[in-house]
Amino acid sequence: GALGDAATFSFFPSKNLPCLGDGGAVTTDDDAVAQRVRRLRFHGSDDKKTFVEVGYNSRLDELQAAVLRLLLPELDGWNAARRAAADRYAAGGLGDHVALPAPVASAEHVHHLYVVRSDRADELAAALAAQGIGARGYYRTPIHLQPATAGFAPAGLELPGTELAARTHLALPMGPELTAAQVDETVAAVAAALG
């Protein structure tokens, strides 16, 4: 938790550091937060006998931990490859057609996803799919409009920026295995689709 009380990491197979199935970790330097996280991950129990709150069965098993330990030395190289692909997208003129991810001066992006913005995101996704290039909008319906959570939103809640981001975002191909030729092909396909 360098920036807050705790930090979370997902090790889902599609993430930058993947395990074989679902997995994750929480880091903190707060003993009370650490105790609560440990309790929640084991059904809400501190001692396997008394359940003091409703929890989950969310322990990282030894096989997943072993896979992560084997893959961890690859992470820096994979992240460098993702950054190189992102740099190539930007250098190739992609920004002439879509809004690129904005750099943050105090951080170094590892580009789990490469998300661009366009008022024609759905049209662009269809054009890329026709060329065999995978691209998608991940969060088209914002959480305050999802059936399971809409009841928690205050009546009349308007989040125009959130709704705009949901409509206009599109994740382009990204990963450490992405080649320069694939990046160039995607940039060319975006240019052709959006003119």
In which residue ranges do the predicted regions lie?
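Conserved beta-strand and immediately adjacent loop positions that scaffold enzyme active sites
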Residues: N16, G23, L113
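PLP-dependent aminotransferase class I/II
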Residues: D29-G195
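Conserved active-site segment immediately N-terminal to the catalytic lysine
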Residues: G1-L20, D47-V52
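Short beta-strand-to-turn element immediately C-terminal to the catalytic PLP-Schiff-base lysine
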Residues: A2, S10, G24-D29, R69
